[in-house]
């Protein structure tokens, strides 16, 4: 059963998804245009933006990923949920 979360949870998750979508598209573009300086700059900007959004989300709602992608704090938060795929 999915846990109830506030609207801010969904807003932040949508921002992360949008930033990561841009990164996927830029990655595909850069596979065929590896020397496009503007695209490289945009990729690096969105990469930093995505990391920022994920840190912000995790500080409020817990880890998005496991296997070392999200450092453990005082407690092991992974099992506390809700997990991103449960909402």
Swiss-Prot record:
Domain of life assignment: Bacteria
Protein task: The cotJ operon proteins affect spore coat composition. They are either required for the normal formation of the inner layers of the coat or are themselves structural components of the coat.
Stated name of the protein: Protein CotJB
Annotated source species: Bacillus subtilis (strain 168)
